[in-house]
């Protein structure tokens, strides 16, 4: 992270003996080439790495996904207000997941993020399955849809 102030997270692994893979993450849509260069220059210095190691710096892979939930609200709840609140909660969820490399998108966590006091039930429509994100990937939410499908007395 000290190589460039834009770096928010980093993954370091050794995919093969004698090789070090460094994957820096920034808040930018694409990791700028200057960040890759800065990390390479800092980590490839002979006083930093063993002489036999090869340093590879790579941009992270973006794993796009969309969030869609169907919610049933308790009677008396205002659909527009609650839709906005749930959308905001899902935006926070997506932002938190985007901030680190390798954070999985788990359907039960999506449902939990929607559990406001006015929500009776949540069905996660998308993603259709849990998304397992590798340490060299970051999850990137491309859209959020909240459908109010009904009301219940509880």
Predicted regions and their residues:
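An aromatic-glycine-centered, glycine-rich loop/turn in mixed alpha/beta architecture
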Residues: 84-154
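Carbohydrate-recognition loop of C-type lectin domains
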Residues: 1-103
């Amino acid at each position: 992270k000290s190589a460039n102030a834009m770096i928010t997270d980093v993954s370091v692994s050794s995919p093969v003996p004698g090789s070090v893979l460094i994957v820096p993450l920034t808040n930018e849509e694409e990791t700028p080439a200057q960040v890759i260069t800065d990390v390479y220059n800092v980590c490839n210095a002979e006083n930093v790495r063993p002489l036999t190691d090869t340093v590879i710096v790579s941009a992270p892979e973006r794993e796009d996904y969309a969030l869609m939930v169907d919610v049933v609200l308790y009677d008396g709840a205002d659909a527009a207000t609650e839709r906005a609140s749930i959308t905001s909660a899902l935006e926070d969820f997506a932002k938190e997941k985007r901030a680190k490399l390798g954070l999985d998108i788990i359907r039960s966590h999506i449902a939990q993020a929607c559990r406001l006091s006015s929500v009776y039930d949540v069905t996660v429509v998308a993603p259709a399955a849990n998304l397992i994100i590798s340490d060299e990937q970051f999850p990137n939410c491309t859209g959020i849809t909240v459908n109010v499908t009904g009301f219940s007395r509880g």
